[in-house]
Amino acid sequence: MRTRIREFRAKYGMTQEELAKKVGVRRETIVFLEKGKYNPSLRLAYKIARVFNARIEDLFIFDDEELWGK
């Protein structure tokens, strides 16, 4: 899964540490999310989207193969 978290953080002038504190995770979790090495829970995805006043699908991008297992 690809994410646009880094892009949104830059737009809001926010560090990984600041975002992590806002959503209640460690900075390393944000690092892994941004690198596509971790799929967030629905709850975490929702929290991150709320921080940026965005929709979950604006931040997390699935390709069809990932989504449908093709």
From Swiss-Prot:
HTH cro/C1-type domain location is 5-59
What UniProt keywords apply to this chain's record, in alphabetical order? DNA-binding, Transcription, Transcription regulation
Q: Which residues form a coiled coil?
A: none
The protein's GO terms of the molecular function aspect are: DNA binding
Record SMART domains: HTH_XRE
Listed Gene3D superfamilies: lambda repressor-like DNA-binding domains
PROSITE patterns referenced in this protein's UniProt entry, alphabetically:
HTH_CROC1
| Ranges of the DNA-binding region feature | 16-35
**Origin, by domain of life?**
Archaea
InterPro entries, per the entry:
Cro/C1-type_HTH, Lambda_DNA-bd_dom_sf
Identification of the protein by name? Uncharacterized HTH-type transcriptional regulator AF_1793
Q: Which organism is it from?
A: Archaeoglobus fulgidus (strain ATCC 49558 / DSM 4304 / JCM 9628 / NBRC 100126 / VC-16)
